[in-house]
């Protein structure tokens, strides 16, 4: 999973060193996020963790310890992490919704429908219960995947020294 979403460590010179550092930091990052979100019972994995989806249901309370844990995990990139999380929080809707914090698939497993299969149960619940869903797409490829599942881009977040993210909203579909 650490190779599925390498956005925390900024792009720049020394590409090999940057990739190496990402591989060191991101497993701890994803582990801390998954552990924090497990209590919501909306965390899914497929094919021996080749793909995972981490959702928060409507009314989920923030884990107040998670930022501290993540700051310790990402070490010298904590300031950047908090900057990114602040940008995300500023765009986050306030109404009750399902929030997809993380969807990732290992590169060798991408394009097989694993991510779609992991979104399906929650999106079906959204439709049945008439609850919207929200996420931030972190790449053009992911943005296109989410559009295929009924999400619409609502804004744009430009990360300092990094790629653009797109907040996306999905209204419940009639069933």
Where in this protein do the model-derived segments appear?
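Helix-loop element at the rim of GNAT/NAT acetyltransferase active sites that forms part
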Residues: 1-20
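Conserved GNAT acetyl-CoA-binding A-motif
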Residues: 96-99, 125-138
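Long, positively charged, glycine-interspersed low-complexity recognition regions
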Residues: 97-98, 119, 151-175
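N-terminal secretory/targeting leader peptides
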Residues: 1-3, 101, 121, 143-148, ...
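Active-site rim helix/loop that mediates acceptor-substrate recognition in acyltransferases
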Residues: 19-42
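Conserved acyl-donor/pantetheine-binding loop and adjacent beta-alpha core of acyl/acetyltransferases
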Residues: 40-41, 49-110, 160-164
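Conserved acetyl-CoA-binding loop-helix of GNAT-fold acetyltransferases
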Residues: 105, 111-124, 148
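Conserved active-site alpha-helix within GNAT-family acetyltransferase domains
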Residues: 116, 128-130, 139-156, 160
């Amino acid at each position: 999973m650490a190779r599925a979403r390498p956005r925390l460590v900024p792009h720049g010179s020394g590409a090999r060193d940057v990739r190496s550092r990402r591989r060191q930091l991101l497993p701890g990052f994803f582990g801390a996020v998954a552990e924090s979100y497990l209590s919501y019972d909306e965390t899914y994995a497929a094919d021996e963790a080749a793909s995972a989806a981490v959702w928060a249901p409507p009314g989920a309370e923030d884990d107040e310890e998670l930022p501290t844990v993540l700051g310790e995990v990402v070490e010298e990139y904590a300031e950047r992490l908090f900057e990114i999380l602040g940008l995300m929080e500023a765009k986050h809707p306030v109404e009750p919704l399902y929030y997809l914090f993380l969807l990732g698939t290992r590169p060798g497993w991408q394009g097989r429908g694993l991510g779609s299969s992991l979104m399906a149960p929650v999106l079906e619940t959204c439709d049945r219960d008439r609850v919207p869903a929200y996420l931030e797409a972190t790449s053009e490829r992911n943005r296109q995947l989410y559009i295929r599942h009924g999400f619409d881009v609502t804004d744009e977040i430009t990360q300092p020294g990094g790629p653009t993210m797109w907040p996306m909203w999905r209204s419940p579909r009639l069933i």
